[in-house]
Structure formats: structure tokens, C-alpha cells
């Protein structure tokens, strides 16, 4: 897909702050530091529209990125970080649950996992949460360039089995460094965002 225009439109913590207009939305979920910002930047050919951070838990709001004036990527707070108070985690959990369970414009979710390691308990819970609410899921296994090519299929199989993925759900190996998986990711996303 040729992205001509991309902008961060709003950062929201509650429904009244979400953008209106009914454009389709794709949520991006994943552990802190799994590479969500790098994924967004690679997908839209920008270096730093989505700010990358080495500090886990940097994204504390739902960030709505309007792409080509036609749909949104919604970057949701990363999970699985230790340095945040239980109260903060609870607040973020409530915010995410409200978004995922009530947002009609939400058409699909991208769950990002780190290809180098088996998915975490939090990854499994997130996948099950999305399936429970019947939100279509595309799993993106990031940092593929950090895994030797000969081991890609083995790591992908471990990810599929750990998440207990449904047969029809795509698992795409992705690298923000090399661009691997970018075309496949767009191919999987377009049916949900083409209006």
C-alpha cells in the first residue's frame, strides 16, 4: 500500500476523546518494547511519526494515527512491564478493555510478539481476550532480522502453538530493519480497512 499521508490525530484515555467520523480502525497491541512504534513507522514509510522508546510502558494513551485520511492505526499501551504501579496498570487495563469491547469502528487487531522468544503469558492472555470478543487478529512476529533465517519456521511454529492460534489467523514474520513482512502485513490488513 502506498501511504501518502499519516498523522497522529489524537491521544485518548476515554471514549469521549476518541476521534469521530466512523473510519475503520486497526488496534496494535503487544508487550512493551515489542516494536509497535517501529512497526507503524515501517508500514507508513516514516522514520519517527510513532516515537520509539527504550523505556517500557512509554505509550500510556490510545494513540490514533490517521492513514491516508481513510483509516486509523490505534497504538494501545504496551503490557507486561514491571516498573508501573498496580493502580496504573489497572487504569490502563480498564482503558483498553473499554476500547476493545465498545468501539464499533474497530475492525481488527494486530498482536505483535517478539519472534526471538516464545510468546509470554501476557501475549497469550491478549490473544485469548481478542478471540473472546471476536475481534479478527493478525499476529505479527517482530524482530525477524534478529533470528537466523534457518530458524524462522521453528520460531513461528512455537509462537503459533504457544498462542494456540486458530488455523485461519495469519502469523507474519516482520522486520522493521529490513522491511520483511511489510507487504504481507498490508495484504492481511487491507480487507479490514478498505472502505
From Swiss-Prot:
- Any signal peptide, and if so, which residues? none
Question: GO:BP terms for this protein?
Answer: division septum assembly
Positions the record marks as coiled coil are none
Q: Does the keyword Iron-sulfur apply?
A: no
Keywords, A to Z? Cell cycle, Cell division, GTP-binding, Magnesium, Metal-binding, Nucleotide-binding, Septation
Judging by the UniProt lineage, the source's domain of life is Bacteria
Q: Which cofactor does it need?
A: Mg(2+)
Q: Where does GTP bind?
A: 30-37, 57-61, 75-78, 142-145, 174-176
State the GO CC annotations.
Answer: cytosol
> Which SUPFAM superfamilies does this one have?
P-loop containing nucleoside triphosphate hydrolases
Task: Name one molecular function that GO assigns to this entry.
Answer: GTP binding
Q: Does the keyword Nucleotide-binding apply?
A: yes
Residues given in the record as Mg(2+) binding sites: 37, 59
Please report the stretch or stretches of sequence annotated as the EngB-type G domain: 22-195
Tell me the protein family, please: Belongs to the TRAFAC class TrmE-Era-EngA-EngB-Septin-like GTPase superfamily. EngB GTPase family.
Q: State the protein's purpose.
A: Necessary for normal cell division and for the maintenance of normal septation.
Q: Which HAMAP family match?
A: GTPase_EngB (MF_00321)
Q: Which PANTHER family match?
A: ENGB-TYPE G DOMAIN-CONTAINING PROTEIN, MSS1/TRME-RELATED GTP-BINDING PROTEIN
Name of protein? Probable GTP-binding protein EngB
User: Its gene?
Assistant: engB
Amino acid at each position: 500500500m502506498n501511504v501518502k499521508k499519516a498523522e497522529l490525530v489524537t491521544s485518548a484515555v476515554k471514549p469521549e476523546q476518541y476521534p469521530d467520523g466512523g473510519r475503520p480502525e486497526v488496534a496494535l497491541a503487544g508487550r512493551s518494547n515489542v516494536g509497535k512504534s517501529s512497526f507503524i513507522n515501517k508500514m507508513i514509510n516514516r522514520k519517527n511519526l510513532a516515537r520509539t522508546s527504550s523505556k517500557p510502558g512509554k505509550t500510556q494513551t490510545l494513540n490514533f494515527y490517521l492513514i491516508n485520511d481513510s483509516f486509523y492505526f490505534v497504538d494501545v499501551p504496551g503490557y507486561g512491564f514491571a516498573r508501573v504501579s498496580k493502580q496504573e496498570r489497572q487504569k490502563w487495563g480498564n482503558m483498553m478493555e473499554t476500547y476493545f469491547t465498545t468501539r464499533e469502528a474497530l475492525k481488527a487487531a494486530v498482536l505483535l510478539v517478539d519472534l526471538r522468544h516464545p510468546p509470554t503469558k501476557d501475549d497469550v492472555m491478549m490473544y485469548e481476550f481478542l478471540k473472546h470478543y471476536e475481534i479478527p487478529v493478525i499476529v505479527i512476529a517482530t524482530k525477524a532480522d534478529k533470528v537466523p533465517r534457518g530458524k524462522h519456521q521453528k520460531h513461528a511454529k512455537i509462537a503459533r502453538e504457544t498462542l494456540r492460534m486458530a488455523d485461519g489467523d495469519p502469523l507474519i514474520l516482520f522486520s522493521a530493519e529490513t522491511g520483511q513482512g511489510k507487504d504481507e502485513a498490508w495484504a492481511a490488513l487491507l480487507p479490514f480497512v478498505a472502505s
